[in-house]
Amino acid sequence: MSVAIVRFPGTNCEFDTQYAFSLFGGVTYIVWHQDKSLPTDCHLVVIPGGFSYGDYLRCGAIAQFSPIMRVIKDFALQGGYVLGICNGFQILCEAGLLPGALKRNINLHFISQMQSLRIVSKNNAFLRSYAPNQEIRLPIAHADGNYFIDERELLELRANEQILLEYTDNPNGSVDSIAGICNEKKNVFGLMPHPERAIEDMLGSCDGKAMLDNLLHIAEMK
């Protein structure tokens, strides 16, 4: 079970992500953003959190043009599984792999806290072990987590069960309290909370374990 973890200039969560997937039996590779290929046995691509290119211009706006993103787009189009966490979610939106955009938090401040969330849809590889409306706790740490999408596309997200998670108290102003989504084919996932930081009791929550474990093992079966 191999996982390609993409590193951009400014990425800072690659080693947390690497550690998390290694706990579930994943063989992890750190892939540089200038690379033009993925490992030949790659089952899953993860774009971790951080501040790619210092978040200059707009979060993820520069990273979307890196050579590796063309490879990831092809990988996703062929049905490969892709996960974007925090800055990775922003990059996937900028690259057009996920709909919508992430704006500055409504309070204009960086928010770092343990956050209560609610499972919206479990009909996907990422959340299949959870129950609908189940409340979980994951850390968030972002300044630009305010998810925006227009009304027409929001209706499509709902109809296609693409909304994965919602905040219970909407700390950043996101439309419909959305914290995570997937694409229509349900092989590209993005969320602002950090499941890789919630895999051990000593970290305050284990609620992220099943997300990563589910996705890794489903991706291997593809």
Swiss-Prot record:
Entry's localization field: Cytoplasm
Entry keyword set: ATP-binding, Cytoplasm, Glutamine amidotransferase, Hydrolase, Ligase, Nucleotide-binding, Purine biosynthesis
Keyword Ligase included in the entry's annotation: yes
Limits of the Glutamine amidotransferase type-1 domain: 2-222
Catalytic activity: N(2)-formyl-N(1)-(5-phospho-beta-D-ribosyl)glycinamide + L-glutamine + ATP + H2O = 2-formamido-N(1)-(5-O-phospho-beta-D-ribosyl)acetamidine + L-glutamate + ADP + phosphate + H(+); L-glutamine + H2O = L-glutamate + NH4(+)
GO molecular function: ATP binding; glutaminase activity; phosphoribosylformylglycinamidine synthase activity
Active site residues according to the UniProt entry: 86, 194, 196
Gene Ontology CC: one annotated term: cytoplasm
GO biological processes: 'de novo' IMP biosynthetic process
Protein EC: 6.3.5.3, 3.5.1.2
Top-rank lineage group of the source organism: Bacteria
Keyword Phosphoprotein annotated: no
Pathway membership, UniProt: Purine metabolism; IMP biosynthesis via de novo pathway; 5-amino-1-(5-phospho-D-ribosyl)imidazole from N(2)-formyl-N(1)-(5-phospho-D-ribosyl)glycinamide: step 1/2
Listed SMART domains: GATase_5
Main location, first listed in the record: cytoplasm
Pfam family, any one: GATase_5
Biological role stated in the UniProt entry: Part of the phosphoribosylformylglycinamidine synthase complex involved in the purines biosynthetic pathway. Catalyzes the ATP-dependent conversion of formylglycinamide ribonucleotide (FGAR) and glutamine to yield formylglycinamidine ribonucleotide (FGAM) and glutamate. The FGAM synthase complex is composed of three subunits. PurQ produces an ammonia molecule by converting glutamine to glutamate. PurL transfers the ammonia molecule to FGAR to form FGAM in an ATP-dependent manner.
Assembly behavior: Part of the FGAM synthase complex composed of 1 PurL, 1 PurQ and 2 PurS subunits.
Protein name: Phosphoribosylformylglycinamidine synthase subunit PurQ
Organism of provenance: Helicobacter hepaticus (strain ATCC 51449 / 3B1)
Lineage of the species this protein comes from: Bacteria, Pseudomonadati, Campylobacterota, Epsilonproteobacteria, Campylobacterales
